[in-house]
Amino acid sequence: MMSFSQPDAFSPSQFTSSQNAAADSTTPSKSRGASSTMPLTVKQISEAQQSGITGEKGAPFVVDGVETANVRLVGLVSGKTERNTDVSFTIDDGTGRLDFIRWVNDGADSAETAAVQNGMYVSVIGSLKGLQERKRATAFAIRPVTDYNEVTLHFIQCVRMHLENTKSQIGSPAKTYSAMGSSSSNGFSEMTTPTSVKSNPAPVLSVTNGSKTDLNTEVLNVFREPANVESEHGVHIDEIVKRFRLPEAKIKVAIDYLADIGHIYSTIDESHYKSAFNE
């Protein structure tokens, strides 16, 4: 299901060495709770250890001491095969290759997979399944990369998360980490990485008591409301604008940021978004 060859395309040696260090120090017993959507490389996934009893079916995988719920990869598509009920493809990110399957349930799924072709850079959000040496990945969101700075940004996010999580293992209490490795009580309270490939500052929302609340978190909380999680098509941008009574441009900045880091993804069009982490 997985192969871990080392192709010539962008192979960051420094990052590879840091991953090897992480693999040596990470064991299932160091798990600190599941992260939401973790930016990872294929090499990190290949070295991930399964938590719980060895060989236990359904046990989550652990990377740098953190259980993975959903993962995000960026890489080149190859071997795309279309069937009536699913589309399979391979992602090559320069550190290895990982096979994915994307189930096709409706027209929106078909349109999403049709936009992806062999030789194209894509961003994929999915989950890991299987046992220790037989990992497989199921994709539930895939989109083409239109700005190639996103490839570099993804690797920066992987490095940052690796450093944050491995550093926290030394003499610190157990924590739950957000997708970018910042400690938080709910996994989402801090998002301090670059807001996009253009490195715009994260928008903030001034509330009535004079304090400033991270607008990204406020918008994300709307997507995570039970009714919106259950909605087939997610939430329209206009609904977010009405909720916060802020300029549409400001809301779009927050939504673009959340989509860039994998917390939400577009559904039927570029105006509808849904949480990538459903509780």
From Swiss-Prot:
Assembly notes: Heterotrimer of RPA1, RPA2 and RPA3 (canonical replication protein A complex). Interacts with RPA1A, RPA1B and RPA3.
Portion annotated as DNA-binding: 71-145
Family in the record: Belongs to the replication factor A protein 2 family.
Tissues expressing this chain: Expressed in root tips, roots, shoot apical meristem (SAM), young leaves, flag leaves and ears, and at lower levels in mature leaves.
Family annotation (CDD domains): RPA2_DBD_D
Subcellular location per the Swiss-Prot or TrEMBL entry: Nucleus
Function according to Swiss-Prot or TrEMBL: Component of the replication protein A complex (RPA) required for DNA recombination, repair and replication. The activity of RPA is mediated by single-stranded DNA binding and protein interactions.
Domain of life, per lineage: Eukaryota
Residue ranges, compositional bias (Polar residues): 190-199
Region annotation (Disordered) ranges: 1-39, 181-210
One Gene Ontology term of the molecular function aspect: single-stranded DNA binding
GO CC terms, sorted: chromosome, telomeric region; DNA replication factor A complex; nucleus; site of double-strand break
Gene: RPA2A
Entry PTM: Phosphorylated in a cell-cycle-dependent manner (from the S phase until mitosis). In response to DNA damage, recruited to DNA-repair nuclear foci, as a hypophosphorylated form.
Membrane-spanning intervals of the chain: none
InterPro entries per record: NA-bd_OB-fold (IPR012340), RFA2-like (IPR040260), Rfa2/RPA32 (IPR014646), RPA_C (IPR014892), WH-like_DNA-bd_sf (IPR036388), WH_DNA-bd_sf (IPR036390)
Protein name, UniProt field: Replication protein A 32 kDa subunit A
GO BP field: DNA replication; double-strand break repair via homologous recombination; nucleotide-excision repair
Entry keywords, A to Z: DNA damage, DNA recombination, DNA repair, DNA replication, DNA-binding, Nucleus
Chief location of this protein within or outside the cell: nucleus
Induction cue: Repressed by sucrose starvation. Induced by gamma irradiation.
